[in-house]
From Swiss-Prot:
One of its GO terms (cellular component) is extracellular space. It comes from the Eukaryota. Residues 37-85 form the BPTI/Kunitz inhibitor domain. It comes from Cyriopagopus hainanus. Residues 28-33 form a propeptide. This is Kunitz-type U15-theraphotoxin-Hhn1d. Belongs to the venom Kunitz-type family. 03 (sub-Kunitz) subfamily. Serine protease inhibitor that inhibits trypsin at a molar ratio of 1:1. GO terms for biological process: envenomation resulting in negative regulation of voltage-gated potassium channel activity in another organism. The keyword Secreted applies. The record marks L39 as: May bind Kv1.x/KCNA. PROSITE patterns: BPTI_KUNITZ_2. Residues 1-27 form the signal peptide. Transmembrane segments: none annotated.
Amino acid sequence: MGTARFLRAVLLLSVLLMVTFPALLSAEHHDGRVDICRLPSDSGECSRFFGMWYFDGTTCTKFVYGGYGGNDNRFPTEKACMKRCAKA
């Protein structure tokens, strides 16, 4: 029973890595810098409710930010988001 549970955990971890790793790679520039505009929205770890904006690959979209943590694809206004992430 313990071996089956361990193998299930390894399989789950493998699937999570296969799904997550390409997304992280696609956010990197060739020189190793992360393009914050390609990161997914991340509401953070707290339970506050701040209206913020993130770039979804096409346009800026409003989301609720918890106030702590998350990533840098987070802007206080739609204008700031578009200025940083929208390509001319």
